[in-house]
């Protein structure tokens, strides 16, 4: 029987409970007050179906008319729901508009061999190359939602609706969110309309806000997914170690070789003959081809530059157009050596190319390289036919290249027959812009006249050069200094190319000023580093990317340090790039002459007589001069501004 009165212990317990209840009640009142206040300051989003529906961009790529008809049907379904979406041919769509779109709906068939139909070929190339391009960034399309419906036939087996799946994979790799899973219609299965109607229903509900959508985005690894789809799961195979492949720090996962009946097959062969290896192994080839390279022979490559595409469309040229007067739409970007002696932290390729300190590979004929490079380049230019903005006359000019940037990737002067290759380019009246990484001074000395010869000056001290370039040579600093000195004896145009990386080398202006006396170059190009994504081999972030104003400040300070020998001559704001030029050579009567008279250069080369850089200079147009309101943008071109997303912040214009 319990006691008639509470004990002291029970009384204390009751008091504690009352205090706890009072505390909880006070807290509840406080949090309720805060919640009500937050709701007043931040009203909740309207429930599904009440908010404004995004305006979709509805594209079709039709081969026989089926996809076009389906897109029209989707348009009607959306109209019934109060949403306007007019079907448009993908052939007339500009991929540069993708980052600014809220919602993309795409209906397309699969063409021969699993490829997209011709009407979507340019859009497909743009997406595929952007997805593989480290510079684009995984957040390029982070503001885009999308859904894709494919039209095909299961009779074609594994290529059934392959094009639709590829578009989905590329879009997700660029950060876009897939709100409805890929719809796969079978024209021979008898249920195309049923499958399409079901897919349309989900799209309409998502657009109206009645359904959240699946939300798959770039967090999934699209390329791994592709490899899984293409893998062969035969039970009688086993993986073998791929360590015999001759490469260093290759980005990405190497495909495993297969063993059948005790023999290794496939990916590990490097195509070498008589003990001499090919530079480009199958793994390296696959990695570079994903990035849009066309591999030539066993060690060379060519790739169409985005500025070539830009000027073909009348949207402006690269900084070389502003500084030196090249026609960007007639410029071929190539290299006779994909190998390099450095592993720079800002490498655009994330070290997907081979490395080496000397030539140890099979060597291709220089004339074959030039022929193949021009052939591959013109094929890529031809693919621009029909792209919005490309004019026939520009396309015709682009099919006849007049400039070659030997700066694609790797170290071009490692190629033993570089002089023969240069002679052949000049014989065809193709000017040469060669970039070397300042590790082969003897080869610089033996180079024949180049239209313009660059040396990369990535740091001003031994310690920072080692950190930035990560060179293979132990005597890298001595090689670097000797390379700069080798420029001093060149009569043709020479350039120091500086890439500024905040936190790495942008604070070394006094050291850079001291290096000027070694090579006494005609020009100094100063460019902010291009953000190309982080990886296991590069930890650069957007914090390391300087603003254009930072580059300008650095350039002006370096010009002052030169004591009047150099002045700031030109700028290309879009590329975050500034040019310093020697005053006594290129500033005549107060006007800059940084442009090149290309016809005169070829006359001088053909003559075989000695000549100087002043012998083929030309007047710089006013719009390219430093401080002009155009910022280095050619007023004859049409300015087109893209929306860019690099995760942290967008660069100032």
From Swiss-Prot:
Keywords assigned by UniProt, alphabetized: 4Fe-4S, Iron, Iron-sulfur, Lyase, Metal-binding, Nucleotide-binding, S-adenosyl-L-methionine, tRNA processing
Record note on cofactor: Binds 1 [4Fe-4S] cluster. The cluster is coordinated with 3 cysteines and an exchangeable S-adenosyl-L-methionine.
Signal sequence segment: none
EC number in record: 4.1.3.44
Residues bound to [4Fe-4S] cluster: 340, 344, 347
Pathway recorded for this protein: tRNA modification; wybutosine-tRNA(Phe) biosynthesis
Superkingdom to which the source organism belongs: Eukaryota
Catalyzed chemical reaction(s): N(1)-methylguanosine(37) in tRNA(Phe) + pyruvate + S-adenosyl-L-methionine = 4-demethylwyosine(37) in tRNA(Phe) + 5'-deoxyadenosine + L-methionine + CO2 + H2O
Domain Radical SAM core: start-end pairs: 324-567
Family annotation (PROSITE patterns): FLAVODOXIN_LIKE (PS50902), RADICAL_SAM (PS51918)
Record domain Flavodoxin-like: where: 56-204
Any GO BP annotation: wybutosine biosynthetic process
Region (Disordered): 211-276, 630-653
Residues that, per the record, bind FMN: 62-66, 148-180
Cofactor(s) it depends on: [4Fe-4S] cluster
Acidic residues bias (residue ranges): 221-249
InterPro entries the record matches: Aldolase_TIM, Flavdoxin-like, Flavodoxin/NO_synth, Flavoprotein-like_sf, rSAM, tRNA_wybutosine-synth, tRNA_wybutosine-synthase
Family: Belongs to the TYW1 family.
Entry function: Probable component of the wybutosine biosynthesis pathway. Wybutosine is a hyper modified guanosine with a tricyclic base found at the 3'-position adjacent to the anticodon of eukaryotic phenylalanine tRNA. Catalyzes the condensation of N-methylguanine with 2 carbon atoms from pyruvate to form the tricyclic 4-demethylwyosine, an intermediate in wybutosine biosynthesis.
Protein's name according to its UniProt entry: S-adenosyl-L-methionine-dependent tRNA 4-demethylwyosine synthase
Gene: TYW1
